[in-house]
Amino acid sequence: MDKPESKPAKVWNDIFDKPDYIFGTEPNDYLVEKKEYFRPGRKVLMVADGEGRNSVWAAALGADVDAFDLSEKAVEKAEKLAAEKGVSVNYFISGVDEWDWEEAKYDVVVVIFVQFATPNMRTRLFANCIKTLKKGGLLILQGYTPKQLEYKTGGPSILGHLYT
């Protein structure tokens, strides 16, 4: 018997169950600024990677990329994008609390706009990101601050989901 879909997984599957790529297929601009960290031989983890635009880009630069997302639909689209671009990415369906945060495994961990985690989940997530980094590794993090609420241009509307 299949495991029942969790409520968050269902929400994200519904969001990603569309033919187009919600955020496009080009990498996040902030991540592109960090291009030098994704050279061949670097082991990279993309957390909550969505439809794969960032993981595919990093793999195209030669990085050895693992990526996970809670949404099966997002991972399916990520795998399709990787195949279209001719790159290899190790994709997994997982939530941040279910992921196997192996100690000192990655040179780079990327967390881009994981804004819907509760403060407690975010504390666990960030601790696990540090745990899974090799000594001297790099955590690349991008998220909204409380100032974003004034702009009303996207992101979460819950203050506790914003980074301080």
Regions found by a protein language model. Give the residues of each.
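Conserved class I S-adenosyl-L-methionine
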Residues: M1-R39, K147
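Conserved SAM-binding loop of SAM-dependent methyltransferases across substrates and taxa
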Residues: E51-A63
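Conserved SAM/SAH-binding beta-strand->alpha-helix loop
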Residues: S71-K73
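Conserved SAM-binding strand-loop segment of SAM-dependent methyltransferases
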Residues: K85-D97
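A short acidic, Gly/Pro-enriched loop at the edge of an enzyme's catalytic core
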Residues: W99-V108
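A short, conserved alpha-helix within the catalytic core of class I
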Residues: F116-C129
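Conserved beta-strand signature within the Rossmann-like core of class I S-adenosyl-L-methionine
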Residues: G136-Y144
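Acceptor-substrate binding/catalytic loop of class I
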Residues: L141, Q148-T164
